[in-house]
């Protein structure tokens, strides 16, 4: 059987942190594994949107850079040599007459005995700055993603937004930029209290409650932004080198909504086995929902083994759902 017709035990749709850990765990269960990822690299949103940001709620890490966490997860699964298909967006998943699944992407067709969906928040794109002239500076010095913190060294930076991402980026940029301002339309920030406390103690200029109303530049780069006080008359112009927009992201399930799965809003409904409404298809991570669900990477790390163990039992009912501990497997 060649690679194109090979039937894998487990195919994981989504190569973010939960998908990577699921691949490792499936390898420990001696499963043949394939990861299908729509982006050009593994890591999901951590690698694409926040590679330089620190994550503070991963067990065993007081703080870990997002890309470092991804690199460690890739290293962890490497001994099991999973097959990886990058830049392949899955269009459909259909159960065949023989009980296996046919997974069709824009590039290829894959086959699997069971499927684990770890697609995070689905397809996503940033909420953009809706101002005249802004679009021409996107990709120049208006940014929605930060891949390299060092590029802002010695520069004057303004960050717009009031959530965790905006506050975290402002605090990280303070260490490298010559000056940082954060602009938010409300007086109160929505970020974690600890981060807001650090922000208030920092040298960052806090511009609240203000919104950007105008961007000014020379056609090649943005040079100034005009701020307007919300429900007030105060106007202020900032001279800046970079403008970072953190208005959040718009996500959608994309083709997943057409796969016949039970959905609740933008999530896939699962039971205590992490099983969807279609037997043989399981979920883990932010893509799934159940009563009491908490959307954290750490939660997804716990859900992945549950999904894998039950998928293995689906493939072969003689297989134990509760496996040996990893300390025994690697001795």
UniProtKB/Swiss-Prot annotation:
Sequence similarity: Belongs to the ferredoxin--NADP reductase type 2 family.
Catalytic reactions on record: 2 reduced [2Fe-2S]-[ferredoxin] + NADP(+) + H(+) = 2 oxidized [2Fe-2S]-[ferredoxin] + NADPH
Enzyme nomenclature, EC number: 1.18.1.2
Gene3D superfamilies cross-referenced by the UniProt entry: FAD/NAD(P)-binding domain
Lineage, opening ranks: Bacteria, Bacillati, Bacillota, Bacilli, Bacillales
Positions with a binding annotation for FAD: 37, 45, 50, 90, 124, 286, 327
Species, as recorded: Listeria monocytogenes serotype 4b (strain F2365)
Assigned keywords, A-Z: FAD, Flavoprotein, NADP, Oxidoreductase
Signal peptide: none
Cofactor binding note of this UniProt entry: Binds 1 FAD per subunit.
One Gene Ontology molecular-function label: NADP binding
Pfam families listed in its UniProt record: Pyr_redox_2
Subunit structure: Homodimer.
Keyword Cytoplasm found: no
This protein's name: Ferredoxin--NADP reductase 2
This protein's record includes keyword Flavoprotein: yes
Swiss-Prot/TrEMBL cofactor(s): FAD
């Amino acid at each position: 059987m060649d690679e194109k017709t090979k039937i894998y035990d487990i195919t994981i749709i989504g190569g973010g942190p939960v998908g990577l850990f699921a691949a490792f765990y499936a390898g420990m269960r001696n499963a043949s594994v394939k990861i299908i990822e729509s982006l050009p690299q593994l890591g999901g949103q951590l690698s694409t949107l926040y590679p330089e940001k620190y994550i503070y709620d991963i067990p065993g890490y007081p703080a870990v850079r997002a890309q470092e966490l991804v690199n460690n997860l890739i290293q962890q699964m490497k001994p099991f040599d999973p097959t990886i298909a990058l830049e392949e967006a899955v269009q459909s998943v259909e159960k065949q007459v023989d009980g296996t699944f046919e997974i069709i992407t824009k590039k290829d067709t894959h086959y699997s005995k069971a499927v684990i969906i770890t697609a995070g928040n689905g397809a996503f794109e940033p909420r953009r700055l809706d101002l005249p002239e802004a679009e021409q500076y996107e990709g120049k010095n208006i940014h929605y993603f930060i891949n390299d913190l060092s590029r802002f060294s010695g520069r004057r930076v303004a960050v717009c937004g009031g959530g965790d991402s905006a506050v975290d980026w402002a605090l990280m940029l303070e260490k490298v930029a010559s000056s940082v301002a954060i602009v938010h339309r409300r007086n109160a920030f929505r970020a974690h209290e600890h981060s807001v406390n650090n922000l208030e103690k920092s040298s960052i200029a806090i511009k609240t409650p203000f919104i950007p109303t105008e961007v000014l530049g020379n056609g090649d780069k943005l040079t100034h932004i005009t701020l307007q006080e919300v429900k007030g008359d105060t106007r202020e112009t900032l001279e800046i080198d970079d403008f970072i927009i953190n208005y959040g992201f718009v996500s959608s399930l994309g083709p997943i909504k057409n796969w016949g799965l039970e959905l609740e809003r933008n999530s896939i409904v699962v039971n205590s086995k992490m099983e969807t409404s279609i037997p043989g298809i399981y979920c883990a991570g932010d893509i799934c929902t159940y009563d009491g669900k908490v959307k954290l990477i750490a939660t997804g790390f716990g859900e992945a083994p549950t999904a894998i163990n039950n998928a293995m039992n689906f493939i072969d009912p003689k297989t134990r759902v509760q496996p040996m501990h990893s300390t025994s497997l690697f001795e």
